């Protein structure tokens, strides 16, 4: 229910019933953290107040505005540079439907692609570069559409969708060669799964804190922006028209059915407030042969700390294995 007092959401939880057509268990709801990690700035009070009013008097206008905000990646100032010891890579690019995707490459050997998450950029997975190069791989990291140096897609500059991000992943693999492995974070994992389901050649997958079920994020988005069911329903419809499919069909469990189930290591922390750990448990349970590595103690910044967590990095590199084997 929208808050007429215009208070910030604060530390509160939402419980989302998982009894939906894809077989979720209503006795075990997903718990959503409204405040999140705090890395992104809170929604401005004037925006929350505007959505509260639009929910009552003009939900169609509110849903149009919400759709544009949803498709706008946040600007996060963390990890703007590669880690120490990682030199500038060889510049490269790929194109899809005339849109340019910008990246860099290091080393020689079988290809491993690094795919950042929503609002990220290619340095975010930079801790994987040195050990993967040392194990005999050529490593390619790139920026998703409307992120950092890459062009926007069909939407206005500064906006994109998960489907456009998947197009970028598929274009990179198509242009530069089959992936011995892909290491992907958050929305980048979903984009990678989509690319694999479309036929991109992927040998092994390392997913860090993936966004397992997209519809649950509408609940979080509504709570953070202070709108209710009318705007949310309009946002849902508009997003489905924009991406050309049901939001339920963007759930990782459903996407995976068309990937051929390549070997998967999924790494996640139960403290992650941005992507629910429970959804990763369900992905692994549905993915034959998949392994779940549970990190501990990364706190409210777990969604981002996992990218620098040495046990997680070591596990991912070992799962991929040396290139000569």
What are these regions (language model features)?
Residues 122, 129-152:
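Conserved alpha/beta-hydrolase
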Residues 157-180:
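Alpha/beta-hydrolase active-site loop
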Residues 273-279:
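Conserved alpha/beta-hydrolase "acid-adjacent" motif
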């Amino acid at each position: 229910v929208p808050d007429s007092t215009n208070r910030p959401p604060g530390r509160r939880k939402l419980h989302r019933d998982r009894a939906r057509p894809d077989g979720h268990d209503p006795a075990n709801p997903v718990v959503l953290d409204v405040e999140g990690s705090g890395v992104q700035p809170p929604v401005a009070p004037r925006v929350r107040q505007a959505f509260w009013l639009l929910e009552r008097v003009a939900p169609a206008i509110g849903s149009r505005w919400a759709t544009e905000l949803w498709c706008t990646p946040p600007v996060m100032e963390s990890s703007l540079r590669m880690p120490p010891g990682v030199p500038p890579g060889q510049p490269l690019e790929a194109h899809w439907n005339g849109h340019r995707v910008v990246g860099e490459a290091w080393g020689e050997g079988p290809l491993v692609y690094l795919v950042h998450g929503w609002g990220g950029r290619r340095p975010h997975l930079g801790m994987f570069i040195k050990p993967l190069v040392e194990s005999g791989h050529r490593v390619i990291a790139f920026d998703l559409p409307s992120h950092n140096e890459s062009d926007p897609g069909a939407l206005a500059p500064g906006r994109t969708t998960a489907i456009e991000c998947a197009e970028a992943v598929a274009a990179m693999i198509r242009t530069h060669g089959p992936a011995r492995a892909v290491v992907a974070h958050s929305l980048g994992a979903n984009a990678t799964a989509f690319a694999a389901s479309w036929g991109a050649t992927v040998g092994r997958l390392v997913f860090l804190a993936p966004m397992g079920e997209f519809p649950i994020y509408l609940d979080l988005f509504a709570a953070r922006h202070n709108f209710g069911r009318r705007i949310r329903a309009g946002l849902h419809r508009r997003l489905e028209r924009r991406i050309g499919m049901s939001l339920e069909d963007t759930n990782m469990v459903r996407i995976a059915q068309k990937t051929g189930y390549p070997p998967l290591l999924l790494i996640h922390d139960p403290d992650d407030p941005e992507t629910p750990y429970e959804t990763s448990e369900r992905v692994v349970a549905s993915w034959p042969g998949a392994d779940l590595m549970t990190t501990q103690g990364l706190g409210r910044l777990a969604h981002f700390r996992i990218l620098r967590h040495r046990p997680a990095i070591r596990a991912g590199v070992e799962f991929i294995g040396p290139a000569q084997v």
